[in-house]
């Protein structure tokens, strides 16, 4: 009888312990469920935040796409500009060659002008000599009337030479005028070439400035891409951490539920054993 009582007390104590463990397991389960719910809420919040980040990333991706298209357009323009620069360089080379030829022609014209001026000077000196001779002949005519016929002959000869020299002078003056016109024409052409060269130089400077501007924009787009990539990696890391935490909590809940189920089975077995003992006592 004492053994039965002792066994009943032990069974009762085991039952109480089982009930305590069951209550503790139920409490742990509720706490775990609350923690799981909190983590689920956190996960939902993180998912919303991740969704917002993805939306923002999509927006920046679209902006990046536009930026890349603009960059490609800028690169195309830069390539076209480089082609224009090469074309302008070739044109400048042709202009420089034409300028060299114009300078050579101008030097030739100046040389001819100098020769014409020398010829005009010689003609002028010849005219002065003839004039001096005519004056001397007139003096001789006044002083020596007996030599009138000879003086007239000398005068006629002098007039003839004078007319010939005058005719040559007219020809030289005409050549001089044409030479001056050609020189002025060459000078005008040189001025036009200089203006065109200035325009080409300014266009080259403008193209270089545009190329630098496109390069600065390209650096800015690359920096934005790097920032967005870092944000995406950070969001993915947070999402992976949240998923691992949820998986860990779900495993903890499963373990607690298994333990609770085991405690319930143990409690059921103890209750059945206690009932059998009570039945045995009643039968006695």
From Swiss-Prot:
Belongs to the tropomyosin family. One of its GO terms (biological process) is actin filament organization. Residues 1-37 are annotated as: Disordered. Residues 1-284 form a coiled coil. Residues 12-37 have a biased composition (Basic and acidic residues). Keywords: Actin-binding, Coiled coil, Cytoplasm, Cytoskeleton, Muscle protein. Homodimer. Heterodimer of an alpha (TPM1, TPM3 or TPM4) and a beta (TPM2) chain. It comes from the Eukaryota. The molecule is in a coiled coil structure that is formed by 2 polypeptide chains. The sequence exhibits a prominent seven-residues periodicity. Its main location: cytoplasm. SUPFAM superfamilies: Tropomyosin (SSF57997). InterPro entries: Tropomyosin (IPR000533). This is Tropomyosin alpha-1 chain. It is found in: Cytoplasm, Cytoskeleton. It comes from Danio rerio. Binds to actin filaments in muscle and non-muscle cells. Plays a central role, in association with the troponin complex, in the calcium dependent regulation of vertebrate striated muscle contraction. Smooth muscle contraction is regulated by interaction with caldesmon. In non-muscle cells is implicated in stabilizing cytoskeleton actin filaments. PANTHER family: TROPOMYOSIN. GO terms for molecular function: actin filament binding; identical protein binding; protein heterodimerization activity; protein homodimerization activity. One of its GO terms (cellular component) is cytoplasm.
């Amino acid at each position: 009888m004492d053994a039965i009582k002792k066994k009943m007390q032990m069974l009762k104590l085991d039952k109480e312990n089982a009930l305590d463990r069951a209550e503790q397991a139920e409490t742990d389960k509720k706490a775990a469920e609350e923690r799981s719910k909190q983590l689920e809420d956190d996960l939902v919040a993180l998912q919303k935040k991740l969704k917002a980040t993805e939306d923002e990333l999509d927006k920046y991706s679209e902006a990046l796409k536009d930026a890349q298209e603009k960059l490609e357009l800028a690169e195309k323009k830069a390539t076209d500009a480089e082609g224009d620069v090469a074309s302008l360089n070739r044109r400048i080379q042709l202009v420089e060659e034409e300028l060299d030829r114009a300078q050579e022609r101008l030097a030739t014209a100046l040389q001819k002008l100098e020769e014409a001026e020398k010829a005009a000077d010689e003609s002028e000196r010849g005219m002065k000599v003839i004039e001096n001779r005519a004056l001397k002949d007139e003096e001789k005519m006044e002083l020596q009337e007996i030599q009138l016929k000879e003086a007239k002959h000398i005068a006629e000869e002098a007039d003839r030479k004078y007319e010939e020299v005058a005719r040559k002078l007219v020809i030289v003056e005409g050549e001089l005028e044409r030479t001056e016109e050609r020189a002025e024409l060459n000078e005008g052409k040189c001025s036009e070439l200089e203006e065109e060269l200035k325009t080409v130089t300014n266009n080259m400077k403008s193209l270089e400035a545009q190329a630098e501007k496109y390069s600065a924009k390209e650096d800015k787009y690359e920096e934005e891409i790097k920032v967005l990539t870092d944000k995406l990696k950070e969001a993915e890391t947070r999402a992976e951490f949240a998923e691992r935490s949820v998986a860990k909590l779900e495993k903890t809940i499963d373990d607690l539920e298994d333990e609770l189920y085991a405690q319930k089975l143990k409690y059921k077995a103890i209750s059945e054993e206690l009932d059998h003992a009570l039945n045995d006592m009643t039968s006695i």
